[in-house]
């Protein structure tokens, strides 16, 4: 029984919601944004929650969520309070949540804004309270349902890593074959060049009656 509980606890830890609290200084609008990266699979549900102080303090915080392929999921200007964005990923990719804290004036440069960010992916992104109410599930049934989805996600992740390893191995083997053929070609070319030089020098020396 203890081993089962340990496994379930491990699964919950692996699929924990990514939560961060950090302080972002106000900068010029031309400065590069600060980005937090996570990884999502194709069709996976994602809930991004950003929270910052509601009061105006000479800083304007904007948030952009996009993936490594350039797909933009949301763009929020002047975040005040809590902003929640829900979407499904278009493909297996890295997901960037980028923050740009711009000072309204030169005097506001150097001010800071405290930001809370949470990124829930897959089973953790679902509203389990709503599911429990709509399907009239018991708390234990909700936990089992959640664990079942997490196990399925872990299985998909393992299959993805396996396929990725196969692709990388095939690429490595293909590269090794090309390097080997290139090395053989260079060696044959050097041998041919050496033979040609010997023949040429022999012919030259004979024409000069040296040999």
Swiss-Prot record:
Cross-referenced InterPro entries: Emp24-like, GOLD_dom
Residue intervals annotated with topology Cytoplasmic: 202-211
Keyword presence, Transmembrane: yes
Membrane topology summary: Single-pass type I membrane protein
Spans within the Lumenal topological domain: 20-180
Keywords linked to the UniProt accession: Endoplasmic reticulum, ER-Golgi transport, Golgi apparatus, Membrane, Protein transport, Signal, Transmembrane, Transmembrane helix, Transport
Subcellular location: Endoplasmic reticulum membrane; Golgi apparatus membrane
Highest rank taxon of the organism: Eukaryota
Signal peptide: 1-19
GOLD domain mapped to chain residues: 33-121
GO BP of this protein: endoplasmic reticulum to Golgi vesicle-mediated transport; Golgi organization; intracellular protein transport
Chief location of this protein within or outside the cell: endoplasmic reticulum
Membrane-spanning residues: 181-201
GO terms under cellular component: COPII-coated ER to Golgi transport vesicle; endoplasmic reticulum; endoplasmic reticulum membrane; endoplasmic reticulum-Golgi intermediate compartment; Golgi apparatus; Golgi membrane
The family this protein is said to belong to: Belongs to the EMP24/GP25L family.
Protein role: Constituent of COPII-coated endoplasmic reticulum-derived transport vesicles. Required for efficient transport of a subset of secretory proteins to the Golgi. Facilitates retrograde transport from the Golgi to the endoplasmic reticulum.
The protein's name: Endoplasmic reticulum vesicle protein 25
Species this protein is from: Yarrowia lipolytica (strain CLIB 122 / E 150) (Yeast)
Designated gene of the protein: ERV25
């Amino acid at each position: 029984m203890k081993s089962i509980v340990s496994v379930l606890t491990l699964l919950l830890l692996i699929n924990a919601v990514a939560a961060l609290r950090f302080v972002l200084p106000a900068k010029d609008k031309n400065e590069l944004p600060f980005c937090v990266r996570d990884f999502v699979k194709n069709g996976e549900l994602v809930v991004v929650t950003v929270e910052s102080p509601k009061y105006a303090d000479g800083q304007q915080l904007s948030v952009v969520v996009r993936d490594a392929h350039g797909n933009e999921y949301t763009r929020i200007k002047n975040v005040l309070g809590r902003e929640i964005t829900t979407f499904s990923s278009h493909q297996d990719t890295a997901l960037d949540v980028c923050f740009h804290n711009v000072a309204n004036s030169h005097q506001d440069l150097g001010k800071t804004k405290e930001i809370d960010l949470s990124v829930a992916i897959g089973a953790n992104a679902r509203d389990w309270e709503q599911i429990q109410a709509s399907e009239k599930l018991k708390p234990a049934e909700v936990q089992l349902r959640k664990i079942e989805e997490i196990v399925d996600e872990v299985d998909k992740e393992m299959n993805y890593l396996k396929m990725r390893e196969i692709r990388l191995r095939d690429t490595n083997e293909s590269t090794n074959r090309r390097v080997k053929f290139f090395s053989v070609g260079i060696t044959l070319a050097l041998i041919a060049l050496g033979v040609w030089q010997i023949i040429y020098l022999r012919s030259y020396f004979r024409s000069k009656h040296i040999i």
